[in-house]
Amino acid sequence: DVRIKNIEIKKVYPSELVVKIEESKPYSYLRQGNNFYVINDVGEIFAYIDEISNKNLPIIDAANKDDLEDILQVLSNIKNENFFSNISEIKKVKSDYEILLNDGTLIKTSIVVNHTKYENCFKLYQSLISENKKVEYIDLRFKDINLKERDLSQTNLEGKDGRDLK
């Protein structure tokens, strides 16, 4: 059963057995067409959404098994639990990956980005958020971390439904 991650059986002298069962933990949702499944950290489907209590999991949008494996590799480099819990969705775009955070911030990344760069990215993100700055995207695909702030000066001066006020 894919819900079982590990089983350990020990014989305790003279005639006792100790059985330890470690269950797989929900890691993320997998979107396949219009269906959503819960997967573990190695990409095995093991539950439907309504079967788990933790609903704060990222959505993986993978077109095929290779994309899923690559996305899981990207996610495995995000060690910070606060960062991971802020991920809304991750998907492959051409040969790179886009991570969408809960507040709409986009992180552009690649499969070769390591955990240290993700740590630095999250620290930068937190400092910008604490200064009430809005980030459009953070790009980790280059040697240095690049970012683009949202231009808050652009406001909708048009009518409520988008039409000019004439």
Spans of model-derived segments:
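Charged, solvent-exposed interaction patches on well-folded alpha/beta domains
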Residues: V2-K166
